[in-house]
Amino acid sequence: MFKAFILTLAYVALRAESLPQMRMSPSEVRGSALDGSQVGSSGLAGVHTKVLFGDPSKAGFYSILLFVPAHTTIQAHSHHDDRMATVVSGIWSFGYGDHFDANNLKLLPPGSVYSEPGGTAHNHFARTGNDSVVVHICGFGPTDTRYFNPADEPKPAK
């Protein structure tokens, strides 16, 4: 399950200037501060990120964990940078296109990998089922999130 996660991290770490030593068990990761408004996240309420390395808003390598609650749909969007992702837990339903299309979703169980090509018209979308999902994402910032349809952009909480 974590083999793909480790291979992804090893690949991108080779391009990083200085990767610090870090060891965190799942309970330590979940117990540390999570941010719902992190750059490069969907911006949806309930979706949280944990930055493992770097700063997604700045130039350079970054690594984040994305925590997505059950029954969440993320509409078609893209990111400025190329990103590689590994499903850590849960079943992630993922697809490419300029609008959400349930017929274009592929079920990705833990250990699955996928790409998020940046700077192109290759938008992507996702959905969770009855369980929450954790995804590990690596990229070279700065990153952003641009929704294909501006009406799908999450609105700030009032």
For each feature predicted by the language model, list its residue ranges.
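Short acidic-glycine-tyrosine-enriched beta hairpin
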Residues: W92, D98-T120
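Conserved short histidine dyad/triad with adjacent acidic residue
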Residues: A59-H79, L107-L108, P117-G119
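Extracellular/periplasmic catalytic domains that process cell-envelope and extracellular macromolecules
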Residues: S42-A45, P56-K58, S78-H79, T86, ...
